[in-house]
Amino acid sequence: MAVGSTPKKPKQKRRSSDHRKHHNHDDDAATMASPAPPRSRGYGAYLRRCFSPPSALVVLCLFLLCVIWKRIPISRLPPPPRFYSFDVVNEFPHDPNAFTQGLLYGGNDTLFESTGLYSRSSLREVQVYHQMDGSLFGEGLTLLGERLFQVTWLENTGFIYDRYNFNKREKFTHQMHDGWGLATDGKVLFGSDGSSTLYQIDPLTLKVIKRVTVRYNDHEVPFLNELEYVNGEVWANIWQTDCIARISQEDGLVISWILLHGLRQGLLRSGHTAIDVLNGIAWDKEKNRLFVTGKLWPKLYEIKLRPVRGPSNGRIENLCPIRA
C-alpha cells in the first residue's frame, strides 16, 4: 500500500460488526435475566404457577375456617365468671334465735322469713309470727301472688299460706329429693334439695317440669340452699359457705360469685360467736335493694355489690368449697 493512501473500510466494517454482535449478546443476556410478562396465550401457565397446589390449599383452609367460625353459636359460649364483693348500706336488727332458712321481700318494706330447727320452726313477718308444728323443720320460702310457698327439711311436704294472715291454705307433696330452697320468677317455682340440681316446678300442679345441673368450671356445684330470683338469674346460698352463686336458669352455669365472708367475720369479731353460716337472700325489685342474713345472726344487712377481679386470698374453690 502506498504511503498516504487511506485504509480499506471492509476491515473497519468487520470490527463494527463484531462490536454490534457483542452488544447484542449483552442485551440478550439482560433480557434472559428479567422474564418478560406473560403473553395472552400464556396466561393459563402463569395462573397455574400462581395457584399451585400448596397455595390453593392454604386459601381453601382459610375459607373453611371462616365458614366454620360463622356457624359457631356464640351465644352458647359461657361468659367468663365474675366476682363481687359488697358494701353495707344499712343494718337492721334480726332475731338471733331465728335459724333462717328462707327470706324474701314482700313489698312495702316487709320481709317474710322461714326459720328452721325442730319445735322452733316458724313463718314470720315483722311483728307477725306463725308457730309451725314441732315435728316439722321449716326451709325455703317464696311468694307468688298472694300465696306463700314453703318446703320442709327431710320431708317431701310443703305448705301454701295466705300472705296476709298466714292461714294455711294447702298442704302439698313435691318431687324433689328434699326441701331446701324456693324462689320464683312470677311464672314458675325454682327449688333446691341440697344437691347440684336446680328444679323448675309448676305452681299449679306442683310437679317438676325441668331440671338443670348447676356447674362451674366443668364441675358440679352441690349444696344449693336458699334461693332468690334476681333480674333473670337464680341466686343460691351454698350450704356451709359464705358464698352466693349467680346461676343461669336456662343451662345451670354459674355466671358469677358473690363473696360475703366479711359479714360473718365482722360478727365474730364483735363477739357473736354463736352464729351459723350465711343463709337468706331477699331482693326488692322495685328499689333494687338486696338484703342478706344468716342462721342465728343478730343482724340483717342491706348491701350493694361491687365487682372485684377475683378472690383476694386464693382461688374460689378455697373460699367456696364447691366440690363434694
Language-model features and meaning:
Residues P54, D87-L123, Y129-T142, W180-G181, ...:
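Beta-strand-rich domains and repeat architectures in extracellular enzymes and scaffolds
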Residues E91-P96, Y129-S135, E170-M176, V212-E220, ...:
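Surface loop/turn motifs at the tips and blade-to-blade linkers of beta-strand repeat domains
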Residues M1-R48:
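Short, low-complexity, Lys/Arg-enriched N-terminal segments of secretory-pathway carbohydrate enzymes
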Residues N108-Y118, G145-N156, L189-S195, V234-Q240, ...:
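Conserved beta-strand positions in repeat-built beta-propeller and related beta-rich domains
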Residues V126-G179:
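Blade-loop segments of beta-propeller domains
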Residues L62-D87, D109-E125:
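Blade/loop signatures of beta-propeller domains
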Residues D162-F166, D202-L206, S248-G252, K304-V308:
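Short loop/turn segments that connect beta-strands within beta-propeller blades
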Residues T100, L224-E226, G271-W283:
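Signature of short aromatic-glycine-proline-rich micro-motifs recurring in repeat-based ectodomains
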